[in-house]
């Protein structure tokens, strides 16, 4: 009979692969930002929340806090690096208002993590106690991470457009939450179960919204506009063009037409 630990590890490896795909799913969004040199209506909220979430889970999975959690550490360590790259790009192409907001949030997150690490290592002296404290924080901020797309979901409902809610991100979020919820239920870990269970719910809501508003999303206009065809003008040609009698005065009186003589040198 296959042991639960083996099954759990296998599910965890699959979860690592799916989570890696989740971390990479915004790449088209950031390619678009770099190409346009503008963040447009994209929000930094999900990436700021994910950054803090990754930092907390890396700390949670360390041997000094929660032993035998290497799968938690590996994927969140990778995610931490990827999110840092995303936020750097977002910062570079944001306006001053967004840059200031991001700076405040990032500084707050750094101070918060420093306080958590020092508080746990100096104030809690057993793995059980450290796991409890950090696990509660992970559950809280993991829930915030998964709920951060709610701001984008509200925008979808308001604009009836899914342009700024990538389908790939929603699909991978659903699969990721489903996998890690299963992982946590094999050997019950309530701190992993809560945020990922909610992640499944929120991702499902996004997929439903996508199905509802996909057809009402405005199509992008073709930037390659066709210019009107201009017939060649012959040498010494006179062109008669209508003129609004209320707008133009010719020789002190109103004129309905103006004759323009064009001479083309050979």
Swiss-Prot record:
The keyword Transcription does not apply. Coiled coil: none annotated. It holds the Pfam family MtN3_slv. GO terms for molecular function: sugar transmembrane transporter activity. Residues 10-97, 133-216 form the MtN3/slv domain. Disulfide bonds: none annotated. One of its GO terms (cellular component) is plasma membrane. The chain crosses the membrane at residues 10-30, 46-66, 70-90, 102-122, 132-152, 166-186, 190-210. It is found in: Cell membrane. InterPro entries: SWEET, SWEET_rpt. Residues 1-9, 67-69, 123-131, 187-189 are extracellular. Residues 31-45, 91-101, 153-165, 211-266 are cytoplasmic. The keyword Repeat applies. It is a multi-pass membrane protein. Gene3D superfamilies: 1.20.1280.290. Keywords: Cell membrane, Membrane, Repeat, Sugar transport, Transmembrane, Transmembrane helix, Transport. Forms homooligomers and/or heterooligomers. Belongs to the SWEET sugar transporter family. Mediates both low-affinity uptake and efflux of sugar across the plasma membrane. This is Bidirectional sugar transporter SWEET7b. It comes from Oryza sativa subsp. indica. The gene is SWEET7B.
């Amino acid at each position: 009979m296959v042991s639960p630990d083996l099954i759990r590890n296998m599910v965890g490896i699959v979860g690592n692969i799916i989570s890696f795909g989740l971390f990479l799913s915004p790449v088209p969004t950031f390619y678009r930002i770099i190409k346009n040199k503008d963040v447009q209506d994209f929000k930094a909220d999900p990436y700021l929340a994910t950054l803090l979430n990754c930092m907390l889970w890396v700390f949670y999975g360390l041997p000094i806090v929660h032993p035998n959690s290497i799968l938690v550490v590996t994927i969140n360590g990778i995610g931490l690096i990827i999110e840092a790259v995303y936020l750097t790009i977002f910062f570079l192409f944001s306006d001053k208002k967004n840059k200031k907001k991001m700076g405040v949030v990032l500084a707050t997150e750094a101070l918060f993590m420093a306080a958590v690490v020092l508080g746990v290592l100096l104030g809690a002296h057993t793995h059980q106690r450290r796991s409890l404290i950090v696990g509660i924080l992970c559950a809280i901020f993991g829930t915030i991470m998964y709920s951060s797309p709610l701001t984008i979901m509200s925008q979808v409902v308001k604009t009836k457009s899914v342009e700024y809610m990538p389908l790939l991100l929603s699909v991978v979020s659903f699969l990721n939450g489903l996998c890690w919820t299963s992982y946590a239920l094999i050997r019950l870990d309530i701190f992993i179960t809560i945020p990922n269970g909610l992640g499944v719910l929120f991702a499902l809501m996004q997929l439903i919204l996508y199905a509802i508003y996909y057809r009402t999303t405005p199509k992008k206009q073709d930037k390659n506009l066709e210019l009107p065809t201009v017939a060649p003008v012959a040498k010494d040609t006179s062109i008669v063009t209508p003129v609004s009698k209320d707008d133009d005065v010719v020789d002190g009186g109103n004129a309905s037409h103006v004759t323009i003589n064009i001479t083309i040198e050979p």
